[in-house]
Amino acid sequence: MMKLNWIIFVTGWMSFRAVGSGLFLFWIFTENERSAPSEWIIPFVGDFIIGITALFLVYHIIKKPSAILWGLLLSWNAVGLFDLIGAIDVSFAAPYGPIPEIGFNELTVRSILILNTLLQISCIYLLFQKDIKDYFKF
């Protein structure tokens, strides 16, 4: 089922949000020269929470689908989407390019945020498809 595989992939992909945000939060709290402006703390915390819960959700999607899990996925994607929209807003208010030497500048950060936003929107859309709802015994 291609739609389900896409949901699993995107949910797993969001685990990378914990890696990046964890590093950037560490830089902020250690006052590293590459640390983000303080406006980024809330989006980073949101990313970290979404990221660390992603792999748990992937496991349950594969092993224990249920109507409750469907609701959790919908909520999780909505919270993740809200966090990303906030981060996009912050990216304009307080631009941040952590590692420009490798091309990870303000534009790259904003592009990644927009990509992840589109991915989360696609999952929310797919969660309302009949075959996906049937899979979750909805």
Where do the protein language model's features map onto the residues?
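Cytosolic juxtamembrane helix and N-cap/initiation of the first transmembrane helix
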Residues: 1-19, 130-131, 135-138
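Hydrophobic alpha-helical segments of membrane proteins, primarily the transmembrane helices
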Residues: 8-11, 37-48, 70, 74-77, ...
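Aromatic-anchored segments of alpha-helical transmembrane domains
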Residues: 16-22, 76-87
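Interfacial non-cytosolic loop connecting adjacent transmembrane helices
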Residues: 28-42, 86-112
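Loop-to-transmembrane helix junctions at the membrane interface
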Residues: 58-81
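Cytosolic juxtamembrane helix at the C-terminal end of the final transmembrane segment
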Residues: 61-68, 124-138
